[in-house]
Amino acid sequence: REIQPRALLLENVRGLSMPRFAGYRQHVLDRLNEFGYSAEWQQIEARQFGVPQLRPRFVLIAMQHRYFHSFNWPKPQGEAPTVGETLRDIMKRKKVFDDDDALNAWVKLANRPAPTIVGGSKKHGGADLGPTRAKLAWKDMGVDGHGLHDDDKPYSRNDRSITALGPKLTPEMVARLQGWDDAEFSWDFEGRKTAKYRQIGNAFPPPVAKALGLAIFNALNAANAPAAMPENSAIKSAVDPIYRVLRDSGEYMTVADIANKSEAYVNELEVARRINLLSRDFDIEEKERDGLISYRLGGFRAFTGQQDHSRHEIFEKNRSRIS
């Protein structure tokens, strides 16, 4: 609102695309529209842009109204190489395997994309390759996912850089799996291996960033920039119809009233279910009259960085299943 950039890109985990967050997503679009931006959400698969990793991300692109009409999401560029193909040259250079036959056997075993590189943070997670299910996937590819090996140290079974599960990866290898290479994309990561791993795992894959960046660049530099768009045409993403009815009304409404006002066909049971979902991100005010409960949409109370938010407790209870 203060800086008024011409374009904005935000990315989050795939979970934000679930129906449970429809009201949350629309609230974000509504606020951006108030500030003069058209916006759209879309799920992007990193492996469709050359990143050898299962890394679905939910991306928001917002642009000032006059530019957004020229924006087109980038088209997938084909499937990425496998983990084995991606890391073959580094494994050979570091002499991880005794000979080429052993290396080739490992490349054949690691014949799929990597699980999501999660990186961790000071509060959540350390220098390993993710939760339990990710470690099992690494095990199936002949990689020990229970830690990392230092870039500047040789491999040896004596220091457990190679175990019965296979070799541990180095930050350089993880960076390659995240999309950095020695040609088009390169970066010097600072700190020790855990710090490097966090920088790598929490970054947006460079090939995906490039594809989205070029799409934004092309829209901003379109030869014939369109005139300002009407405000109501700025929002293209699907919304929760119950959220929309409550938002537009601003008044108390019964479940039957909400169902009747909704453009999409929803029965009263579905209305009640969606109100329950909305209550996780918004204050839903209730009022009883003549034996009927009426509802009104209140303030937004979803996570916006609060240290005391309930999401932290939920994260701790479920961290082994989060990637």
Locations of regions flagged by a protein language model:
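Class I S-adenosyl-L-methionine
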Residues: 1-140
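C-terminal target-recognition/interaction regions appended to catalytic cores
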Residues: 98-323
